[in-house]
């Protein structure tokens, strides 16, 4: 058995080596960047190098107090149900996904700010190209949006998307402040202080991303697997800009090196472990004031991405459409919306912007439901979908019933618009709980009826799931297979995981 395992382990390593060599060859061919496992270790690093070569001339990295100030303005994708309430609704519902949201945001950006950041107090300088500012919100009058514009960090450090923002002090960037002003009837605020740039923009980021998207589209049409490199680089391109400070590092020492290292670094040592081979692993603190990144660029991209989604999420409420309230859930770049509301939204968009909302171009929307990853009920068991795609009769999948418990916790009951009577598939998510754990719970206690399980979750019932097959790495490097019980409950204040 050991020889068998060794043989397949060696074969896996050979296959990985061949794949890496092919990836490296294509990276050199298309980008003249060598992912050589020395200077560049990851796709994010490769993408960042490409942006550095093309888009960051005359711009500066930031560090220290400026970096931490800008970081406090940085908020990830908006993920919530409408008004943060649980939802169970029967209707024709679409899951519309925006193509390449973050690359779209980079194309829409004015560029990367040139020059060094400068300090301001009390008044935002009119000559500012871009700024990050701390404000106190004095007065807000406008629609009570299902998907609020601003997230306020609560006592647990979780972003709470709320319309109740009067009296709050927040740090935001130019785009978010403009959105707060534009999407409300009245918005009054007091400026405290901030940082700004006033030397214009390096505008190459838009053309660089657009070239990558168009090149990927061409390769994809030709069936060239190199299109995946372009996809990876575009999706990873913003993350490396906001790399968090690395505040500690592991040092591995042979026995003869230990005493000298401890004597010279005793004030920075956090933890010491002896490894199975006799070496010593020392966790050592690193100074974070030497960490530089492009946090302001990462925050600008995230702000622009949410701005693009707001133009879809908020417009029907803003114009007081009778179909407002038919967007039920959003997760960063996608929305669950009723079919009739989507048709109206397309019309509103076309009249306002003169472009098509749905399509295959960068930034347009497309339906994201597909059969892969779905489940069916068979013999009172929830099993992976086994029906042939022909049973859809050429129709498109949509959700005929939606259950939303909270963030990243929902169930879609899918069917085909050409064969409603014979097709019923299930697509679900439950953050913090593996698919296998949900399926086991469903089959053991609900006879495969996953709708009944989600009804209990929406009702606020506490539910215990057993997570199995997990790997835990010990401080000494040993790896063990473990299982864990996790209790889930959804309340008015959000999900509780124990």
Placement of each model-derived feature along the sequence:
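Conserved acidic
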Residues: 1-498
């Amino acid at each position: 058995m050991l020889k068998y395992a060794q043989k397949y382990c060696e074969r896996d390593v050979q296959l990985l080596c061949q794949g890496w060599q092919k990836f490296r060859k294509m990276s050199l061919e298309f980008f003249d960047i060598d992912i050589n496992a020395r200077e560049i270790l990851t796709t994010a690093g490769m993408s960042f190098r490409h942006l550095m070569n093309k888009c960051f001339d005359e711009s500066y990295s930031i560090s220290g107090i400026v970096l931490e100030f800008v970081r406090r303005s940085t908020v990830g994708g908006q993920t919530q149900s409408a008004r943060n309430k649980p939802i169970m609704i029967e209707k024709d519902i679409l899951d519309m996904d925006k193509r390449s949201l973050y690359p779209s945001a980079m194309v829409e950006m004015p560029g990367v700010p040139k020059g060094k950041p400068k300090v301001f107090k009390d008044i935002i300088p009119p000559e500012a190209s871009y700024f990050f500012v701390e404000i106190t919100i004095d007065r807000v009058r406008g629609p009570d949006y299902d998907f609020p514009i601003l997230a306020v960090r609560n006592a647990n450090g979780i972003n709470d998307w709320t319309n109740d923002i009067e009296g709050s002090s927040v740090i935001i960037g130019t785009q978010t402040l403009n959105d707060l002003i534009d999407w409300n009837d009245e918005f009054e605020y007091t400026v405290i202080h901030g940082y700004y740039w006033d030397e214009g923009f390096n505008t190459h980021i838009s053309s660089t991303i657009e070239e990558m998207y168009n090149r990927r589209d061409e390769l994809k049409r030709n069936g060239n697997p190199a299109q995946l490199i372009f996809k990876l680089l575009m999706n990873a391109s913003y993350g490396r800009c906001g790399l968090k400070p690395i505040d500690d590092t592991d040092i591995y020492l042979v026995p003869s090196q230990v005493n000298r290292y401890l004597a010279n670094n005793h004030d920075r040592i956090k933890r010491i472990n002896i490894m199975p081979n006799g070496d010593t692993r020392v966790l050592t603190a690193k100074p974070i004031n030497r960490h530089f990144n492009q946090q302001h660029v990462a925050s600008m991209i995230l702000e622009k991405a949410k701005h693009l989604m707001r133009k879809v999420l908020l417009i029907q409420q803003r114009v007081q459409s009778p179909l407002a309230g038919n967007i039920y859930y959003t997760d960063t770049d996608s929305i669950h919306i009723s079919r009739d509301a989507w048709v109206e939204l397309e019309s509103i968009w076309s009249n306002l912007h003169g472009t098509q909302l749905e399509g295959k171009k960068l930034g347009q929307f497309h339906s994201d439901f597909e059969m892969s990853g779905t489940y069916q009920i068979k013999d009172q068991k929830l099993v992976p979908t086994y029906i042939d795609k022909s049973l859809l009769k050429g129709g498109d999948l949509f959700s005929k019933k939606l259950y939303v418990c909270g963030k990243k916790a929902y169930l879609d009951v899918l069917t085909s618009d050409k064969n409603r009577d014979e097709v019923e598939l299930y697509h679900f998510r439950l953050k913090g709980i593996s698919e296998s754990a949900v399926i086991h719970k469903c089959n053991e206690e609900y006879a495969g009826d996953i709708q009944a399980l989600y009804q209990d979750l929406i009702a606020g019932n506490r539910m215990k799931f057993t997570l199995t097959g997990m790997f835990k790495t010990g401080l000494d490097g040993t790896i063990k297979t473990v299982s864990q019980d996790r209790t889930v409950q959804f309340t008015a204040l959000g999900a509780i995981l124990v």
